[in-house]
Amino acid sequence: MKINVRTSVAVLAVAALATALGACSGGGAEKTTSSTGGGGGNSGYTFAMITHETPGDTFWDRIKAGAQQAAKDTGSTLKYSADPDATKQAVLIQNAIDSKVDGIATTLVTPEALIPTVKKAVAAGIPVDSFNSGIDYYKQAGSLVHFASNEFLGGQGAGQRAKADGATKILCTIQQTGSVALEDRCKGVKDQFPNTENIQVNGADDAAVTSAIQAKLSQDKTINWIITLGAAQGLDAVKAVKQAGASVKIGTFDTNPDAAQAVQDGQIQFFIDQQPYLQGYLSVMELYLYKKNGNIIGGGNAVLTGPSFVDKTNIGQILPFVKANTR
């Protein structure tokens, strides 16, 4: 069947955001940064953004860039921290509660480990929104709204594309244990192409990812497609295919400048875009609008920022924005 993404909610949300703006005239060490906006006056608000970022993963640069721009546009202070260990991420959320921030934006990558602490924030009167990971759990957590891509839908689209291209067997790599979003991606692939095998890799070690994929390709010659769940792993797969001397095509979720260039060069067939810049921007803007006006973007429904597919037919339009760190 043909997969279509319904984007009306997201379009309406962004349109509402534009109107509001006009009216307003992680497997690694914890990471913490702070920035103060100055472009939209001084709102006096301090917001915390807490994620499961793995150190060195440039995907999160776009999340942060969007969040920092929203803080600048609203004159708010943004405190960013991250840890890929869910238990430690929960501690960071508790730290934000203890510091009495005006709002919290967080990912829900491992819901069972994070929801109890998120509920503490809500109970303390701190508004929380969520983004990126945990679309099926945000209401349970008490989040106002969730900004994310539909990961299962993206996986289905990837499976469809590989199938149409003549896939015989797909290898789907998962780079973080326990991530509900990553698991949904591979489930979506398998839903459309049952002969899909998942492999767990260490997303914090590119050399190990390359080695694991190369070993699998050498062991199983029936694999002729790889779907990776992150841009860095997509580039690792390119190396693995070359080293294995295999005839294998690659598609990936997410992007960075090198992966986008690889799509243009034909080394990667496509990347699935969830617009991380937009996730970061909307997450901070929602907290500001909620504090100022009681606004809830999307009426509390999940607001989709993806999935959309970028391949050779449209990479020329998207690549400049990827290089500018805004897409």
Where are these regions (language model features)?
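C-terminal motif of bacterial Sec signal peptides marking the signal peptidase cleavage site
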Residues: 19-23
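Bacterial signal peptide processing site
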Residues: 25-28
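Extracytoplasmic "Venus flytrap"
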Residues: 41-70, 74, 78-90, 108-111, ...
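Hinge/cleft segment of the Venus flytrap/periplasmic-binding protein
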Residues: 43, 192-193, 282-327
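Short, solvent-exposed amphipathic alpha-helices that sit
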Residues: 58-73, 154-158, 177-198, 212, ...
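Hydrophobic alpha-helical segments within soluble ligand-binding/sensing domains
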Residues: 89, 145-170, 208-210, 256-259, ...
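Hydrophobic alpha-helical
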Residues: 90, 106-122, 189, 203-261
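Flexible loop/hinge segments that line or gate small-molecule binding clefts
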Residues: 112, 116-153, 167, 256-264, ...
